[in-house]
């Protein structure tokens, strides 16, 4: 399949080709060039990464997608999670038994499901209502719990704003048991979904009425789940769409200008712009680029357990790690206790929580000059008819993928319990993960609530639709997972749109393996060789003799320790290693385990976990 960068997805070898699988895989996947020992490099992991796996036949795949009675399996944690040695209480009760190898949701949705026997609704516990009133349960999670207890169907659907509301507002409404409730508005999807859930719950629990309602014997029927869109609403929707597109085009131009300024004295790196990704912060309508990354490779050499090597230098991953550096700076502004500095920070306190959150009217955008590798590049002509070969192709396209030496392979060919070479999940899969866990990662989750992307903008230079990205991010994980997630976590649905490309796509043979990074506050670009994970000699910024990138794990741990001191959270400083500090973030690890179990249970495959020894270092 042709990728957005003009390259083709690496063919995934399988038994149906009639050739041994190992003959087609690179050395790091256990192919013919793989060696048993790590030449000249110390490593504590010698596990054989490749395991023999058979792809089920098309008939088996179809059989799997037929509706079956739900089974009451014993609850277990995902295999990959146990290898991380993170001990969390009560997590197992939220994770279901893992079954299957291929995704079925999109196929099975087209088939009739066997209805469950009608069960009476459960009585709402007073404790649940009181917790919701006190703000201890976020509205979206509370509404999902309400629907489960009352045994009714729930859908939080995007709609159009009502009345004469103009501007870049998002609108959602809750549909509970076929009845549509009031529309919630917000500057971003998270806020509007939360407001919609609150409006519905307040009415369902009668919290907005001083006296109990008296049901009238007759009256107008409930609002239908699929309301008729009036010409006025259609006009408002059109105005909003056009307004957003103008705004998005300005953001694309802003990204172009920012990157252009950074390489003004380094024009030899202009072709690196083909893979450009950037994060943009919106404050009260004003936009600023805060993090930039480029790159198309990942480190796939032998393990070096010192935390000073960059493992994944794909553009969106590099931009996200640059964003983390921006977050650390913003948090240091907040903890400075200087009122003027705190005012500049994007973070603030929130009642009933010891975690900081983004200030009101602050939104996060992601711009990508091309589609990320993996499921986002699904062929637009694929059809999900279970009687066609396209259904089999779709199962492969929608599964989790691993990036090896810049190419993409299905995780079904990989062992999920650690490897002696470093390989990373595809950028599409990481985006899927961030839309549940947030972009902040485990370390920053000690200080802030999850931060979600409001909108994803894709340059149209070599892309004419975002169907694959929509499926990878907005359809692989169901909204129902939100009710199982810890406080503040949810299944986010970013708005996805094609925009004018910031830079035309170019073939970059001279600097193919290079990755550029920058975060707001940096004086210059840093250039990393993605193949060895170190800074290049020609990089405008150099950290020291070790040539370790400012994005590496060791650098992040150093910033984490500094922030913990400023925030006076001495308990966090007791973590002996980088790995231990991550595992101390209980809610984040719980949410991660639930997501991994969900993906595996629904047939998308196993999330490949890097060897634990990579994180067993300290400063």
UniProtKB/Swiss-Prot annotation:
Residues 138-206 form the DRBM domain. Keywords: Developmental protein, Differentiation, Nucleus, RNA-binding, Spermatogenesis. Testis-specific. Detected in round spermatid cells from stage II-XI (at protein level). Expressed in germ cells from mid-pachytene spermatocytes to mid-round spermatids. Residues 1-50 are annotated as: Disordered. The keyword Nucleus applies. GO terms for biological process: RNA processing; spermatid development. GO terms for molecular function: adenosine deaminase activity; RNA binding. Residues 291-617 form the A to I editase domain. Disruption phenotype: Mice exhibit spermatozoa retention in stage IX tubules and a reduction in the number of sperm in the epididymis, leading to a reduction in fertility. Show defects in germ-cell development. One of its GO terms (cellular component) is male germ cell nucleus. It is found in: Nucleus. Its main location: nucleus. Pfam families: A_deamin, dsrm. The keyword Ribonucleoprotein does not apply. Belongs to the ADAD family. Required for male fertility and normal male germ cell differentiation. Plays a role in spermatogenesis. Binds to RNA but not to DNA. This is Adenosine deaminase domain-containing protein 1. The gene is Adad1.
């Amino acid at each position: 399949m042709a990728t957005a960068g003009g390259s083709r997805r690496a063919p995934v070898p399988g038994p149906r080709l009639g050739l041994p699988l190992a003959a087609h895989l690179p050395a790091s996947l256990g192919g013919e060039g793989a060696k048993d020992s790590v030449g000249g490099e110390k490593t504590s992991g010698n596990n054989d990464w490749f395991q023999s796996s058979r792809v089920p036949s098309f008939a088996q795949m179809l059989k799997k997608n037929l509706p079956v009675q739900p089974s009451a399996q014993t609850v277990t944690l995902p295999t990959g999670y146990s290898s991380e040695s993170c001990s969390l209480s009560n997590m197992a009760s939220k994770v279901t038994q893992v079954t299957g190898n291929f995704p079925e949701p999109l196929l099975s949705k087209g088939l009739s499901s066997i209805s469950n026997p009608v069960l009476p609704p459960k009585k709402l516990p007073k404790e649940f209502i009181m917790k919701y009133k006190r703000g201890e349960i976020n509205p979206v999670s509370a509404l999902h719990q309400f629907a489960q207890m009352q045994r009714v169907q729930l859908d939080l659907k995007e709609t159009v704003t009502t009345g004469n509301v103009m501007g870049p507002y998002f609108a959602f409404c809750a549909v509970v048991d076929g009845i549509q409730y009031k529309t919630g508005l917000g500057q971003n999807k998270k806020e509007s979904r939360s407001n919609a859930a609150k409006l519905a719950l307040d009415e369902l629990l009668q919290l907005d009425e001083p006296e109990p309602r008296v049901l009238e014997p007759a009256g107008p029927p409930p609002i239908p789940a699929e309301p008729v869109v009036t010409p006025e609403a259609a006009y408002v929707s059109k105005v909003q769409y056009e307004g957003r597109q103008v705004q998005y085009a300005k953001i694309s131009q802003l990204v172009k200008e920012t990157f252009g300024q950074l390489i003004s004295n380094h024009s030899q790196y202009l072709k690196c712009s083909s893979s450009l990704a950037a994060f943009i912060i919106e404050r009260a309508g004003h936009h600023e680029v805060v993090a930039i990354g480029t790159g198309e490779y990942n480190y796939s050499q032998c393990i070096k357990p010192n935390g000073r090597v960059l493992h994944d230098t794909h553009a969106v991953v590099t931009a996200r790690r640059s964003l983390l550096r921006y977050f650390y700076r913003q948090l240091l502004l907040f903890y400075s206790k200087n009122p003027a500095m705190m005012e500049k920070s994007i973070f603030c306190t929130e009642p009933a929580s010891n975690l900081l959150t983004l200030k009101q009217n602050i939104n996060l955008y992601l711009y990508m000059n091309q589609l990320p590798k993996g499921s986002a590049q699904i062929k637009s002509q694929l059809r999900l008819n279970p009687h066609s070969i396209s259904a089999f192709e779709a199962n492969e396209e929608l599964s989790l993928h691993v990036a090896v030496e810049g190419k993409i392979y299905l995780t079904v060919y990989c062992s999920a319990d650690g490897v002696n070479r470093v390989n990373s999940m595809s950028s599409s899969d990481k985006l899927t993960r961030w839309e549940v866990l947030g972009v902040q990662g485990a370390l920053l989750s000690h200080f802030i609530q999850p931060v979600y992307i409001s909108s994803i903008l894709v340059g149209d230079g070599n892309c004419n639709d975002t169907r694959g990205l929509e499926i990878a991010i907005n359809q692989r994980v169901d909204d129902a997972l939100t009710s199982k997630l810890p406080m503040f976590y949810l299944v986010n649905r970013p708005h996805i749109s094609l925009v004018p490309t910031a830079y035309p796509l170019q073939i970059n043979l001279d600097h193919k393996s290079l990755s550029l990074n920058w975060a707001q506050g940096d004086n210059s670009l840093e250039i990393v060789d993605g193949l060895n994970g170190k800074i290049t000699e020609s990089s405008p910024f150099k950290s020291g003799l070790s040539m370790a990138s400012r994005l590496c794990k060791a650098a992040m741990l150093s910033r984490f320790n500094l922030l913990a001191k400023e925030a006076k959270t001495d308990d966090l400083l007791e973590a002996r290693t980088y790995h231990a500090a991550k595992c101390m973030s209980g809610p984040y690890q719980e949410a991660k385990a639930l997501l991994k179990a969900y993906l595996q249970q629904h047939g998308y495959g196993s999330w490949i976990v890097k060897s634990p020894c990579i994180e067993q270092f300290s400063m």
